[in-house]
Amino acid sequence: MRENSIRINALELKNVDILSSEAPKEITIVLDERSLNFDFDKSNVKPEYYDLLKNIKEFVEQNNYEITIQGHTDSIGSNAYNFKLSRRRAEAVKAKLLEFGLSEDRIVGIEAMGEEQPIATNATKEGRAQNRRVEFKLVQRETIPMPTENK
């Protein structure tokens, strides 16, 4: 597992305690196998994932994070095609988060990962299904102190 990454079901985000002094300023939410995946060669976000995305939106807003959305694919198809498909997946998730009310300035990036970072084997149908996914990299916003007026 990557450093500063947390593997969770995004539906359980409300139960994540990030307020401890050891909480990372940057975390990657690697959604587990129950979470946001795509059908083969598709980039549409299914309605069954809307609650998950609403939880991510609330988590980002309530904990002062900015988000980068990373799209992934399985290994079927050319590398070039898979990079384009992974971008379309990330863009579709971005559009849905914006539709649910996340401020556009909270989304700081879209990353097309293609087939380069599988989380499961591409040798099986089940593994390929897990690799057709998005991940979310969250970076805590710097809080800038407000200047005080000296009178």
Segments predicted by a language model, with ranges:
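Periplasmic peptidoglycan-binding/tethering modules of Gram-negative envelope proteins
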Residues: 1-66, 140-151
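Periplasmic OmpA-like peptidoglycan-binding domain that tethers envelope proteins to the cell wall
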Residues: 43-50, 72-151
